[in-house]
Amino acid sequence: MARANVASDERFLYDRIQTERRTHPMNIGFILFPNVTQLDFTGPLQVLHRMPGAVTHILAKSPDPVPSDCGLSLVPTGTFAGAPGLDMIVVPGGFGVVEALGDAETVDFIRASGASASYVTSVCTGAFLLGAAGLLDGKQATTHWAYTSLLPLVGAAHAPGRWVKDGNTYTGGGVTAGIDFAFGIMADICGQQVAEAIQLAVEYDPAPPTQTGHPSRASGKLMAMMATRYDDPVKAMRAAISG
């Protein structure tokens, strides 16, 4: 009987939020640019589009398909010029951030939409686009582990964590961290029960066969090898930030 009551209470909560969101939908804008890391985008999208009342907008400079880092082309649902007012912006990362930092139209759109959004968010190196738009000034933030030393260049201080919240700003770590980040946002907006229900719906219960997904659990040898692999990308990002 107690279990039935709990289920009924949770269903009531979910239905109430759905009703409220139908009256006041939440417009969520995902920002695309060439060579974006697709999981930075698709991970949070898969979670946040399930949030009660969410209306997702996949936005780019033009309606043309946007190439991602893995060969998957992503089709925008709208353009920067035609975007509605956004309650939340989500800026993914990827090696394409380096070129996007030099694209005034992309940075200006992030700046303008972020200034009026209730939630300003990024995944991975998307943090540097928020920073270039002046949206990380004085904020605690995170990004992909290889790039955390560059955060002060865009006015932010690095804070440890899979994802970091500072006021209305949420930043996620690298790539897969965007899924955890999205559940954190959902819990803050809709409550823990809704986040738990969606987590079960997508069966998000990661159990990788290896345990080296964070620098704290990787060997010194592995860290040295991967740090070398990121030398050139980090240098390119530093140069792009410095202009």
What annotation goes with each model-predicted range?
Residues T142, A146, A177-D180, Q193:
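Generic recognition of short, well-ordered alpha-helical interface segments
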Residues A2-V120, A127-G131, T148-L150, H158-P160, ...:
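Extended, subdomain-level signal for the structured scaffold at the beginning of enzyme domains
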Residues V120-T121, T142, A159, Y170:
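Structural detector of well-ordered beta-strand residues that form the stable sheet scaffold
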Residues T125-A127, Y170-M186:
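Active-site-proximal catalytic alpha-helix in oxidoreductases
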Residues L136-W163:
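A conserved active-site-flanking secondary-structure segment within enzyme catalytic domains
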